[in-house]
């Protein structure tokens, strides 16, 4: 009986480890890829930058972008 319980726990640990590795190996997001819910998994040469979206002074959401590291973006009028 103890052997069955131990085997079950070991199998559970192995499956959990495999799922965690698969989560870490997700494809990275390319440049200018937009995510609206949360910062994404940008590729290694990019950085994630998030901005709030507002309408009439009320926050209506958030956009996150994968942008080049070290590049400064300025708003043009």
Curated annotation (Swiss-Prot):
UniProt KW Disulfide bond keyword: yes
Keywords: Disulfide bond, Secreted, Signal, Toxin
Subcellular location: Secreted
Protein's name in the database: U8-lycotoxin-Ls1w
InterPro entries (alphabetical): Spider_toxin_CSTX_knottin (IPR019553)
Gene Ontology annotations for the cellular component aspect, listed alphabetically: extracellular region
First-listed, main subcellular location of the protein, grouped into a coarse class: secreted
Top-level taxon of origin: Eukaryota
Propeptide regions on this chain: 21-26
Secretion signal span: 1-20
Gene Ontology terms for molecular function: toxin activity
The record's account of how the chain is modified after translation: Contains 4 disulfide bonds.
Annotated organism of origin: Lycosa singoriensis (Wolf spider)
Keyword Signal: yes
Family per similarity comment: Belongs to the neurotoxin 19 (CSTX) family. 08 (U8-Lctx) subfamily.
Tissue expression: Expressed by the venom gland.
